[in-house]
């Protein structure tokens, strides 16, 4: 039986179509995925992300532990509340999960990990934390609501008290602050400004209803996927998994190679991959009629006349742009155009950077 978040009843009251998402009953949409998508791009929408896992890490060696566990380097985190995005890799350089880590104090950090990878993540973290004496607390007592869009922060702030409004005033992206009952972070998965707000389970339903009253539109998994794809954001198990290097998933920027003497899990394998080369993640745009779908083959001929084939990892119709877009993992050497096989048709596509929309506008 699939689990329910504390907001399940609110979803049904809002008319959601519920689906099983990695063992959780979650809203796919509330009537119109397209309307929900546009609400986030032009105004404010919200998502129940309570199925994601918040993990608090405490102990005097927590920073040392995370510098070993993660490919990105938490030594960069020196201001309380600052966050960074990182892959958590296995010894062969594959991605166990991608996550966000927050720094609060030298002996207190917080991770937010994906729902689909929860059990293996917790097992991996626990296994490697033991020698460092880390206390691990899984925060199943918290729900999380993502409020996203150009008006999201202003509308969410109408629910905050004076101290909470003061706490978030001027807060830059990728920061989080505990303000009363609310943990408020300037993070998201849409390419828009907004907050991800964690709060006690028993207060989540009232907060959700108050956001609806404030004019924030409930949004489901369908819009979440088209929004993140337009923003060029990876989805675990599609753009990367335990067999795929972050170098082949447009995550090279999340690997902290310096200092060279920092030993993190997967480093040796990554260095070999960097030397020998890997596939890469690119964007594809198809303005002709049709939709680019996951797992369709992508073919191209390189400058030397050699033929190559890659694969679409995520594809959809872009509601913001009005045509089809995709992320694709392809061999090195791809040029500005390629061919995608859609049934019995060979469709020309333009090859772009793996990002299509930022802050509601097309990325040139």
UniProtKB/Swiss-Prot annotation:
Disulfide bonds: none annotated. GO terms for cellular component: cytosol; glycine cleavage complex. Keywords: Aminotransferase, Transferase. SUPFAM superfamilies: Aminomethyltransferase beta-barrel domain, Folate-binding domain. It catalyses: N(6)-[(R)-S(8)-aminomethyldihydrolipoyl]-L-lysyl-[protein] + (6S)-5,6,7,8-tetrahydrofolate = N(6)-[(R)-dihydrolipoyl]-L-lysyl-[protein] + (6R)-5,10-methylene-5,6,7,8-tetrahydrofolate + NH4(+). Its EC number is 2.1.2.10. Pfam families: GCV_T, GCV_T_C. InterPro entries: GCS_T, GCS_T_bac, GCST_C, GCV_T_N, GcvT/YgfZ/DmdA, GcvT/YgfZ_C, TrmE/GcvT_dom1. The keyword Cytoplasm does not apply. GO terms for biological process: glycine decarboxylation via glycine cleavage system. The glycine cleavage system catalyzes the degradation of glycine. Belongs to the GcvT family. The glycine cleavage system is composed of four proteins: P, T, L and H. This is Aminomethyltransferase. It comes from Escherichia coli O45:K1 (strain S88 / ExPEC).
């Amino acid at each position: 039986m699939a689990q329910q978040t504390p907001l399940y009843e609110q979803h049904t009251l809002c008319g959601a179509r519920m689906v099983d998402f990695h063992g959780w009953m979650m809203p796919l949409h509330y009537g119109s995925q397209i309307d929900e998508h546009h609400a986030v791009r032009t105004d404010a929408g919200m998502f129940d992300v309570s199925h994601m896992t918040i993990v608090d890490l405490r102990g005097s060696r927590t920073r040392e532990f995370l510098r070993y566990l993660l490919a990105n380097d938490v030594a960069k985190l020196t201001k309380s509340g600052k966050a960074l995005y990182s892959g958590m890799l296995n010894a062969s350089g594959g991605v166990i999960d991608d996550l966000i880590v927050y720094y609060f104090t030298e002996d207190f950090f917080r991770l937010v990990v994906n729902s689909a990878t929860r059990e293996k993540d917790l097992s991996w973290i626990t296994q490697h934390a033991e020698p460092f004496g880390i206390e691990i607390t899984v925060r199943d007592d918290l729900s999380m609501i993502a409020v996203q869009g150009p008006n999201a922060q202003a509308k969410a702030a109408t629910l905050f008290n004076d101290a909470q409004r003061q706490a978030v005033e001027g807060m830059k992206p990728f920061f989080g602050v505990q303000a009363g009952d609310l943990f408020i972070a300037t993070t998201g998965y849409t390419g828009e400004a907004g907050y991800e707000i964690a709060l006690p389970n028993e207060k989540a339903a009232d907060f959700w209803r108050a956001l609806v009253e404030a004019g924030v539109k409930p949004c489901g998994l369908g819009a979440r996927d088209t929004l993140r794809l337009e923003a060029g954001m990876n989805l675990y198990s599609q753009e990367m998994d335990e067999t795929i290097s972050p170098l082949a998933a447009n995550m090279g920027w999340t690997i902290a190679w310096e200092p060279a003497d920092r030993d993190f899990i997967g480093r040796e394998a990554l260095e070999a991959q960097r030397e020998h080369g890997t596939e890469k993640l690119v964007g594809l745009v198809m303005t002709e009629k049709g939709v680019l779908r996951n797992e369709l083959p992508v073919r191209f001929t390189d400058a030397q006349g050699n033929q190559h084939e890659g694969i679409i990892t995520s594809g959809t119709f872009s509601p913001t742009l009005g045509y089809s877009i995709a992320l694709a993992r392809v061999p090195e050497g791809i040029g500005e155009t390629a061919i995608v096989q859609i049934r019995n048709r060979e469709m020309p596509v333009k090859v772009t950077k793996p990002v299509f929309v930022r802050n509601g506008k097309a990325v040139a």
